[in-house]
Amino acid sequence: MGKFKINGGKRLYGEVEVHGAKNSILPILAATILNEGVSVIHNCPRLKDVDSMIEILEHIGCKVSFSGRDIVVDARDVKDSEIPDNLMRTMRSSIFLMGALIARNKKAFISFPGGCDIGHRPIDLHLKGLKKLGVEIEESYGYIRCKGVRVRGNEIHLDLPSVGATENIMLAATLADGITVIRNAAKEPEIEDLQNFLNSMGARITGAGTNTIVIEGVKKLHDTEYTIIPDRIVAGTYLCAAAMTRGELTVVKALKEHLEPLISKLKETGCELKTGNDYIKITCNKRPKAVDMIVTLPYPGFPTDLQPQIVSVLSIAEGTSIVTETIFDNRFKYTEELVRMGADIKVEGRVAVIRGVDKITGAKVLAKDLRGGVALVIAGLGAEGTTVVEGAEHIDRGYESLEKALKSVGADIVRIM
């Protein structure tokens, strides 16, 4: 297990660039197998989860090359429809291959996926939606066997606006007979990115970014070249790191329209933020103020994936803040580690009460998941003394060379084994 060693108290200053969106590249990589040809994808992040998805694609018969920021997927020889358990367990996003394999090979055999342990994340919505398209599904002993001899369009109303279920249904319906309508669809920018990628291959999809998505099935897709959007969660993480260190940071390739809830809350803490077409500049010259309330919600609400980072900032804010987590039921585990650093945080179910302290101090802490782990790095940047964050492999799932990016803007951080 790798670790990050951080000597805190260094003000972040300068310019940092955001890499491509993790939550776009993973479903888009799954989507490449719908095209019996070659797909070229630009602005790809080098992440542990991306490596895992590439390994799965290669296992089922794809030829994949990753050079610089570009991934080329040749999916002409996709034959296998079974993904081994050891590959499925590496990340939750492997579930996207289910819808894609059904569309391409009319069948899929997978185990339940892995990923961060941040609470109950059932795939019932995925399976329910696929069944509405005519897919036969058999579950036994942790495995899922799908058969979709003739996938037909249908109207599907999601019980919850699940990102994963929305994307899996989109993938399965792209080559289906007839028209599929997804109601109460998730609205995240990454879903719109997936729509745009599929349409660049010849799919006929409209409505992504709204609560109703319409997919008109087509017979065949063609080769494409596509650039994915910047990662809004990485951009938000850098903004929180600047707020934690009372820094001045320009985050390049950050789209303000994807980050309005965070920008609003950071302004409430007293930070100054200026935005342009592809950047956000944050200036924080004093101790942050508490915010009355943050409630995580599906997009365009405050993102659950930025909840841990903002809590780190609020741990040293002046006053008391209340944060309510409505998406995942076990996402406050990291607060135990913040308390080890001197934070005053009380968690009751889905609600955290954060009483800001004058300072937190360095400690040895453990990253238990991706976003909670990076929140501990942020805390270490603003802490007095040295912090060691164990479990760097969790953070590597969503951040490319995090220590290099932070070091480039003044952080004293190194990776150690």
Swiss-Prot record:
Signal peptide: none
EC top class named in words: transferase
Coarse class of the protein's main subcellular location: cytoplasm
Active-site residues from the entry: C116
Catalytic activity: phosphoenolpyruvate + UDP-N-acetyl-alpha-D-glucosamine = UDP-N-acetyl-3-O-(1-carboxyvinyl)-alpha-D-glucosamine + phosphate
Source lineage: Bacteria, Bacillati, Bacillota, Clostridia, Thermoanaerobacterales
Residue positions binding UDP-N-acetyl-alpha-D-glucosamine: R92, R121, P122, I123, D124, L125, D305, I327
EC number: 2.5.1.7
Positions where 2-(S-cysteinyl)pyruvic acid O-phosphothioketal occurs in the chain: C116
Residues given in the record as phosphoenolpyruvate binding sites: K22, N23
InterPro entries attached to this UniProt entry: Enolpyruvate_Tfrase_dom, Enolpyruvate_Tfrase_sf, MurA_subfamily, RNA3'P_cycl/enolpyr_Trfase_a/b, UDP_GlcNAc_COvinyl_MurA
Keyword Transmembrane among UniProt keywords: no
SUPFAM superfamilies in UniProt: EPT/RTPC-like
Compartmental location: Cytoplasm
Family listed: Belongs to the EPSP synthase family. MurA subfamily.
Pathway(s) the chain acts in: Cell wall biogenesis; peptidoglycan biosynthesis
Entry's Gene Ontology molecular function annotations: UDP-N-acetylglucosamine 1-carboxyvinyltransferase activity
GO biological process, one term: cell wall organization
Protein name, per record: UDP-N-acetylglucosamine 1-carboxyvinyltransferase 2
Gene Ontology terms: cellular component: cytoplasm
Organism: Caldanaerobacter subterraneus subsp. tengcongensis (strain DSM 15242 / JCM 11007 / NBRC 100824 / MB4)
Entry function: Cell wall formation. Adds enolpyruvyl to UDP-N-acetylglucosamine.
Keywords noted in UniProt: Cell cycle, Cell division, Cell shape, Cell wall biogenesis/degradation, Cytoplasm, Peptidoglycan synthesis, Pyruvate, Transferase
